């Protein structure tokens, strides 16, 4: 069935017509016109058939551009009797369709107005009719004479938009048989029609005149073709337009460009998906894109979506897709283009479980400092971690045991063989995670070589054997038995004297005893040893008020026996006199009476405190918060700034170290007082240990020296596993130095930023728990940190977090405003409660992996936000309960903030129930808003929990509240996170919203004058 497409007046550009086509990405392309027949500009005879003869005349005239062209004219209206009809036919030659499914025809013609021809009686028309006829072959000579009688399909009746009057200069051809070759330029109409679908080899087009005076100046037959195009990394060929018209589509299958592959189902799955498709409509326009292609691994998009270009040298792309190549990870390089993965540099490897974007890593270096303790026929083998871990965290140890016929060096193996099966290892021989192993089943007096290998996830990929350290060992069953018991003889603030009996089985002459001791607050691996030729020893240079663990073993010519059981003794607090066992009875009685008096006084104090609590209604007084302790004794620390001579404070509060015991190594940083270096400290009779050494700048002011030594004296007073330990000071020689334990991993904030996303919520909570425990300990001494933040906490190789920077003065440091409580900002009021606020900011830093609090907001913007009670939102992946704990620490009223012991208890509860630490959302998403704004509900207008639920947009849980009898605000205020699943509230977003509003409800109920419904 033919369809119409009318064009405006005027000429058209021959050959190609600009046409916009709309795809998903909206490109512009050119629709192609494939010409089947065109008489435009013809000057020689065309020779189409006419019926009857003379019904149409072929003449040369001037067109609208005053160019000479061949035309067909029909004008037989003058002189005809009224009512006589005209039936003049004009037929083209046979036109090959050449694959076209639909033909378009563009006609340029001129029609004379009947009114200007002086013809009446209804015999004049200003229209003509267009027909077409399909055929597989041109008409035979026998059928040419009857061509007008064949079965034609009407396309349309063509009417002129404008008919033109017959001018005097052109009237000679317009009526009757008069002809001339000199015409005035014709005024033309332009009409376009289409017909189809075409199914045979070709077709004819015919024009029927039934009484018009017209000139057919140009006839153009053509078909539309969608051009070849590149789109979405696929090429699509030229495609013939549909034969059913503009609304129908022809699908074209695309071919992926070089180094591209089809997306699966058009959305980007694995290779081998369906080829992409475009659809060509009836007007030669591409539309409706389905699917596409994507660049293969090792290739990236180029020139928009036209090409897939090889990744340049030094970059890679592991997965198919239309994303750019990435630079090679650390310690890898791609020497050639189009790399799907970057090969590791020599000596570095990537484990099979490592993703392509992971940096290459190497095997660890050998373990360090092997030593052992003989325990009868067994021994406990110890070692220190390797110096280099290879950039990985999956360090393991293997133990190789060799039995030798004589004492051999570890490097020699000529007379050694693998240990017998009787030798066993506890907990195991391979894959050890701890730096010790118990080796049992050893034969007496047989020399062994124990080799400890350090391995990690890439050790098997290295052609070299694992790095190892070895030690010669031997055991004897004739060594002394264990010392059965140990007694405390006396104690002082800095020393303890102990004694012990002989072993029950000496198995020879006792040569001496080895005493091992360590501070219970520290790791047992930091123990010290001393040798005594008698069964009594005095251990000096201890810390006042600390508990120490002791063990002793005897040595004969056969070797050391096993250590006896551990016993614990405590030094006296600073300032108390020494105590001995044979004390006088009067002293004992006096001590007992004094203790009873003290307990009575303490009981009176407690009763007074309880009475004041009931009267005031606050959780505690500021004085009690700062100065009371669970043991009912007052703890305190000495402020070094009260000393006129800082060296005197150092002598009393810190331990002087002989410089000859110190070995200084490389620089690891710089502080406000001088360079910080790694070093080794090995006092006489003690094991060597790694330390950090800060030396005071030469030529510094005396005030700088006083501050430097004052901080060391302050640090030396606190002994806690989560507080940086002072190892000693050097003040009697130059340069002045302060030695602390070495924290290998540096400040907590930078440590987390370098390892974003590598820890579980449980691990992060454990880090925060350690800091909270340290702050609980400091608060028991009424010590206020004033500068607590993630950068003031250091991390060691065992991921233990320790508080540092004690004595730091925050005055004049605007950078600490982000951690400061409101009362600090407005009144300079530093208390343990302000430390709690700072600790909440530290919690947020930990959960956000070192993100800067309040991001890029200015200090003034931060102050304004805090004053308006805006608070930091939960970091990505932060458990709800943990963020609620942060919000508790950020209470504007400091009396409502939790104590550090409450925070420690909360962390312990989370660690015991790790299922409460499930993250709310994706760890990769950033919060949608900068700060949380507390919802300002009009509580007096809310008369029930149901109304409250509607006000916060959770009315869907009204039935749940009614079912469980939650009829008052007091009931609702007692709900916790653990209660919500039992109420049927399981959506994490709803839980968070409900808990946040419960917190606001609790604040409202605590306000004076609030009425509970």
From Swiss-Prot:
Record topology, Extracellular segments: 32-590
Family the UniProt entry places it in: Belongs to the protein kinase superfamily. Tyr protein kinase family. Ephrin receptor subfamily.
Span of domain Protein kinase: 662-911
Example GO molecular function: transmembrane-ephrin receptor activity
PROSITE patterns: EPH_LBD, FN3, PROTEIN_KINASE_DOM, RECEPTOR_TYR_KIN_V_1, RECEPTOR_TYR_KIN_V_2, SAM_DOMAIN
Protein name: Ephrin type-B receptor 6
Motif extent (PDZ-binding): 1011-1013
Signal peptide region: 1-31
Topology, Cytoplasmic side: 612-1013
Post-translational modification: Ligand-binding increases phosphorylation on tyrosine residues. Phosphorylation on tyrosine residues is mediated by transphosphorylation by the catalytically active EPHB1 in a ligand-independent manner. Tyrosine phosphorylation of the receptor may act as a switch on the functional transition from cell adhesion/attraction to de-adhesion/repulsion.
Short name of any one Pfam family annotated for the protein: Ephrin_rec_like
Compartment(s): Membrane
Free-text comment about domains: The protein kinase domain is predicted to be catalytically inactive. Its extracellular domain is capable of promoting cell adhesion and migration in response to low concentrations of ephrin-B2, but its cytoplasmic domain is essential for cell repulsion and inhibition of migration induced by high concentrations of ephrin-B2.
Segments forming domain Fibronectin type-III: 363-478, 479-574
Binding site for ATP: 668-676
Domain Eph LBD: 33-231
UniProt function note: Kinase-defective receptor for members of the ephrin-B family. Binds to ephrin-B1 and ephrin-B2. Modulates cell adhesion and migration by exerting both positive and negative effects upon stimulation with ephrin-B2. Inhibits JNK activation, T-cell receptor-induced IL-2 secretion and CD25 expression upon stimulation with ephrin-B2.
Glycosylation, residue list: 472
Assembly, per entry: Interacts with CBL and EPHB1. Interacts with FYN; this interaction takes place in a ligand-independent manner.
Organism domain of life: Eukaryota
Topology with respect to the bilayer: Single-pass type I membrane protein
